[in-house]
């Protein structure tokens, strides 16, 4: 059974997308099957960080709406075992049904060793979607007062939800 790991931050620009791409790539290079999901709807960049700019036409909402399956996730052109589901460009996080997203992640646990979710910044609906079904959350911050305050607030919310 695979693990779902969300990479999150209370603030933008902390490096969560870069970390998600790097950890996913390293795990895949070790022979693990890895699915990276960009959950930053409207501001997706995980494809760029993975060196797959505009090469991942399948979004996670395509899977949720059953237009595609997890097996259709875009394979990385150079790194074996690494796959990407991009974020939809026009969807709003509030329009995504959490239970459908959770069911997709449960299916991903069966097909992949790791599912890495690149969460949007902040604590809004996109953040809640990304972390609700995660086994673990990696919280990213940079050493400045605003980032540290936002990280503390985000950690508090995660702690209240019992997501570590």
Enumerate the predicted regions with their spans:
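Structural motif
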Residues: 6, 84-86, 116, 138
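Walker A/P-loop phosphate-binding motif and the immediately C-terminal alpha-helix
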Residues: 2-39
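Short coil/turn connectors at secondary-structure junctions
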Residues: 1-3, 30-33, 79-81, 111-112, ...
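Active-site catalytic pocket residues across diverse enzymes, especially alpha/beta-hydrolases
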Residues: 27, 31, 50, 158
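Conserved catalytic-core segment of NTP-binding enzymes
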Residues: 99, 103, 107-110, 114-164
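P-loop/Walker-type NTP enzyme "switch/lid" segment
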Residues: 36-110
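Asparagine-centered polar/low-complexity signal
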Residues: 22, 45, 161-162
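Short, ordered loop/turn segments at secondary-structure junctions
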Residues: 12, 39-42, 88-90, 121-122, ...
